[in-house]
Every structure is written in structure tokens, then in C-alpha cells.
Curated annotation (Swiss-Prot):
Name used for this protein in its record: Bifunctional protein HldE
HAMAP family: HldE
Its job: Catalyzes the ADP transfer from ATP to D-glycero-beta-D-manno-heptose 1-phosphate, yielding ADP-D-glycero-beta-D-manno-heptose.
InterPro entries: Bifunc_HldE, Carboh/pur_kinase_PfkB_CS, Cyt_trans-like, PfkB_dom, RfaE_dom_I, RfaE_dom_II, Ribokinase-like, Rossmann-like_a/b/a_fold
Self-association and partners: Homodimer.
Pathway linked to the protein: Nucleotide-sugar biosynthesis; ADP-L-glycero-beta-D-manno-heptose biosynthesis; ADP-L-glycero-beta-D-manno-heptose from D-glycero-beta-D-manno-heptose 7-phosphate: step 1/4; Nucleotide-sugar biosynthesis; ADP-L-glycero-beta-D-manno-heptose biosynthesis; ADP-L-glycero-beta-D-manno-heptose from D-glycero-beta-D-manno-heptose 7-phosphate: step 3/4
Gene: hldE
Keyword presence, Manganese: no
EC top class, as a word: transferase
Residues of the active site: 264
Domain of life: Bacteria
Protein family according to the UniProt entry: In the N-terminal section; belongs to the carbohydrate kinase PfkB family. In the C-terminal section; belongs to the cytidylyltransferase family.
Catalytic activity: D-glycero-beta-D-manno-heptose 7-phosphate + ATP = D-glycero-beta-D-manno-heptose 1,7-bisphosphate + ADP + H(+); D-glycero-beta-D-manno-heptose 1-phosphate + ATP + H(+) = ADP-D-glycero-beta-D-manno-heptose + diphosphate
Residues the entry annotates as binding ATP: 195-198
Amino acid sequence: MKVTLPEFERAGVLVVGDVMLDRYWYGPTSRISPEAPVPVVKVENIEERPGGAANVAMNIASLGATSRLVGLTGIDDAARALSQALANVNVKCDFVSVPTHPTITKLRVLSRNQQLIRLDFEEGFSGVDPQPMHERIQQALGSIGALVLSDYAKGALTSVQTMIKLAREAGVPVLIDPKGTDFERYRGATLLTPNLSEFEAVVGKCQDEAEIVERGMKLIAEFELSALLVTRSEQGMTLLQPGRPPLHMPTQAQEVYDVTGAGDTVIGVLAATLASGNTLEEACYFANAAAGVVVGKLGTSTVSPVELENAVRGRAETGFGVMSEEELKQAVAAARKRGEKVVMTNGVFDILHAGHVSYLANARKLGDRLIVAVNSDASTKRLKGETRPVNPLEQRMIVLGALEAVDWVVSFEEDTPQRLIAGILPDLLVKGGDYKPEQIAGSEEVWANGGEVLVLNFEDGCSTTNIIKKIQKDSDK
């Protein structure tokens, strides 16, 4: 299937549903409580993240699309924290405040990347007048390409049929992440995205793929749906549409750390891709790739365009490509468990030339994995002058990540990558040029950890500076 890269900046999506605040308490455990046979967690870090429908909206915004969110909250600190967190990531919120109810909050306590307990603070919003939400939907319909209804059965979507009717009359597709077994509520929707458990709770246990397809097609006909996407965890996802053969996509996940919010990512990417003008098949392709990325992260998470770019070309976030420092540490840890030798180098790599490619290929031959650390734009200006870099950081990193010799690409803001190298501690640190090993940033830390430091020669006659001078000279003719 040929997939067109979505123009997410063109897309506008409205998310309506159950919003909540996810709180995370992190800390080590080293003893058992004397009061009860439970571990004692010394809380050292607290995080607050938007959850539920708010996480869907964040996933849409993280792709660069215009994301609007309508939901019910209380008038409390949790609502204010939720609004601020969403504003920080460019989600446009239009909440209906309900003074008699608290904002739904879920508190998770974690230690060593394991969730120990979850505490829920909620009363549900059933019985709240839905008219203010209908008015907000009506106002937004002229500026969106998709409507997402994110149902967590907390009371925000008690009038789903009215919402579907409003959108369909305006020609806007309606995507629903369902909850419960009453799918009659979702009659006439464009697409439902149940997971396998939710699907089987409605149609019964399916013994094989054929039964999933047969019962799914009956569900589509019964509830007048345009399509059905069944997400199947480690088995990927299956798209069913009337008059078309089923489309099954295997999972792209490399490592699974946490499935929290994965369904939010799927429907968010689906909606943003459809609103960009892509087909439903293409939207599912991107959503499947995004799901493979997000389950490799801890807690509710989003996927950036760079991560999605890596994933769709088969370079999953936990395995290969452009990544953040924290993601790189996870990938390196996984490589070490496999007994792989990690090589690391760094540079500006402004205009990639034959000398760079040859150098990186030679560096890769010295181990099993190659990390390339790249100076940020600000760092490059300080080192090379105000006219550099010619190519911005994101473009430099994407080009490097596309090289067969390069496994991981990461950026750093400082003048040297010493701090980054000290955090990664590669088995072998290499640098090109006329350096002495002791002059290379990070060499002391690598040696102290038992690693090696090596200087490689650049190919003669290749220089970014000379290329720039030649371009300038030719343009002056």
C-alpha cells in the first residue's frame, strides 16, 4: 500500500468526551511497611498529565494538527492543572464547568517502572445537561475535518446520537472509541475503534480471524457504521469496511512498557490523518505505527512527527532512528541486554558529504550499534558562526537517521556532548580528525567505565566549509 505522508498542519480535529487528569507518583521501594504487608514508596517525583479524551487531544496536537477539546470538569485545582497542561501543548480547550462535581483524577504510584496501585477520584457526570456541549460542537463543525468521541463511560457522552447527527449533517466524519456493550448508542458513526476485549464483549468470543471478520461485518451492518477497526494488542489491528476485503496490520511494537493511553493514540492519529485528507487505509497504517511507538513509553504518551516518520519506515522508536536522550538510554539498555557493542560519535553534520558517509560506515564496523550525537542549531552557531548551520537540526538528524550505518541519532544543546556521553557511556567512543584521544569530549568518562576511545581519519578532500565556499562562489558568478 502506497502511503502519502499526512499534511497534519492542514488538519483540524474536535475531541469530545471524558477528560481526566492522570497523576503519577514515582519513587524507590526498599522496605515493607510495618503496618501491612505492602511496599513503602519514597515519593521523589510527581507528574501530572492530561488523560482520557484530553490525551486524545494531546496526541492530535503533538502531530502539528489543530486540536480542540470539549469535556466536563469540576471547578477545582485539577481542572486548572488540566487546562494549563493542555494549553502548554497547544490544545484549545472549551470545557463545561460543573460546580457540583470534581474533575476526574486518576493517581498511579510507580516504582522501578512498575505500577503498584491506582487510586480514582471521581463521581461521574451522568445527569449533567448535555446542551452546552452540543452548542460547542455546532460552533466548531465548520472548521474541523473530523470529530472524535472519546467514551470512558464517565457521563460526558450521554447524548452520543445527537452529536453524531450534528456532525453527519455537516459532512464531518465521526470516530468513536467505544465503551461498554451498548453499541446501539453509536449507530451511524463513521468508525468505531474497539479493542478485541470490547469487541468480543459485544459479539462473543472469536476463535479465529475469520470469525472476527464475519462478526465485525455483521456489526457494521446492524449499526449502520461506515467502518470498524478492531485493535488487537500484540496481533496488530484489523480494518473492516462494507464491500472491501479486510485489512490486517501486524503490530510494529518492539518493546512494550505500558499500554496506558495506546487507544487514545490510535484514534488521535486516525482522526488527524483523515482530517489531513488521507484515506482511511492510510490513516490506519499511521495509527498502527504510532501505537507501536507509544506502548514503548511509560504512562499516557504522545507521538511526535519525527517518531512517526521513523516508525512508518520500519525504524521503530525503541529500535532505530531519531530519538530523545531518554529514549536513547532505553534503546542502549536493550542493546546491552542483547550483548551488543555500542559505538558513539558526534558532530555538526551540516551538509552531509562523502567523507561523512565513509567515516560513519567505518565507525559502524567497529561495533553492533552506532549512535550519532548532533549539535543543536544554537550549539552550531556558537561553534561555527552566525551563518551556520545551513540545514536545521531536524533535517540534519533525519538525513543521518536514513543512513544504513547509523542506528540512533540524538541532539545536544551544549558546545560538547560530554554530559550526554557520560549518561550513555558507550563501549567505544570515536571521533574523526586530528584529535588525540585524551582531547575528545567524554573520553575520561568512557575510559573510567572500561570503554575505549579511538580517532578515525576523515576522507581527504571532503569538507563542509569548502562545499559552502564553492556554492557561494558559484552563486556570485
